[in-house]
Structures are given as C-alpha cells and as structure tokens.
C-alpha cells in the first residue's frame, strides 16, 4: 500500500466501541466494522458488538453465529464489511504479534482500542498484510 487509507468514524460509533470494551473489561472485546468506501476513504456506518467467546484478556474469537448475523444485516442494508475491531485491556493500541499472525484479510481495517489508560482510551486503525502492519489515518467526527 503506497498511501494510507483514511478511515472515518463518528463519535457515536467510537462511544459504542468504548462502552462495549469497558463492559467486557478485563477481557478483550470485539466486533465488526461496516460501511462504504470511496476514493480511498472508508466511512464506517455501523459498528457491530460481538461476544468474545475466548473470554480472555490476551486474545479474542468472535462468536461465529453473531458474526454471520452481523454480516447478513450489514449487506441487507447496503453496507460492506470493512474490517473488525477489538480492545487491548492492558496493552497499547497497535497489533500484537498474535494479531499480525492471525490477520486473515489484507484489505480489512483492523481497529484496536487500548484501555491501558482508562482515563484516556486510545483507538487506532491499521492494515495488516504479509506479516506487517501499517497505520491508517483515523478521523473521528461528530
């Protein structure tokens, strides 16, 4: 990728992710991102909140039934699956070695919310491919 992709996320969707991550703390929380993409800009229009069936603070696995239902719902509403998000309860907002190893879609946006500082949660977006991650430009708006 020569140029970073821009990802737009509303404050409302950020709060939705944050509330789900805080409710799941100290375990990782997870979900899917849906929206539209045009001219290198990904506009996230829906955030799905899924169950981490691993119930772990070091890794996550999305509930397969919830994942399928969320994808069906987003497609029925004319949205595309654009990626996923998960929280890091105690580590920085960047992909761990396990995140990089398990990344399955080089075209997906991977958002990571760090709750390491509970006072100032930190959300970042990445692309992961060929064993490496690249930052995406994340724009939060009202």
Regions found by a protein language model. Give the residues of each.
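Short, well-ordered beta-to-alpha junction loops that form the rim of enzyme active sites
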Residues: 87
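Conserved beta-strand-loop surface patch within small alpha/beta domains used
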Residues: 1-81, 90-142
């Amino acid at each position: 990728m020569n140029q970073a992709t821009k990802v737009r996320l509303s404050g409302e969707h950020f709060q939705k992710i944050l509330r789900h991550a805080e409710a799941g703390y100290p375990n990782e929380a997870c979900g899917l991102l849906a929206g539209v993409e045009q001219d290198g800009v990904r506009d996230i229009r829906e955030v799905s909140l899924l169950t981490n069936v691993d119930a772990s603070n070091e890794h996550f696995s999305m509930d397969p039934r919830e994942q399928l239902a969320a994808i069906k719902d987003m497609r029925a509403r004319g949205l595309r699956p654009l990626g996923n998000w998960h929280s890091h309860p105690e580590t920085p907002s960047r992909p761990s070695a396990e995140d990089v190893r398990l990344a399955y879609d080089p075209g997906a946006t991977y958002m990571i919310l760090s709750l390491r500082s509970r006072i100032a949660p930190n959300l970042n977006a990445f692309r992961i491919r060929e064993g490496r991650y690249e930052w995406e430009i994340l724009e939060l708006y009202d």
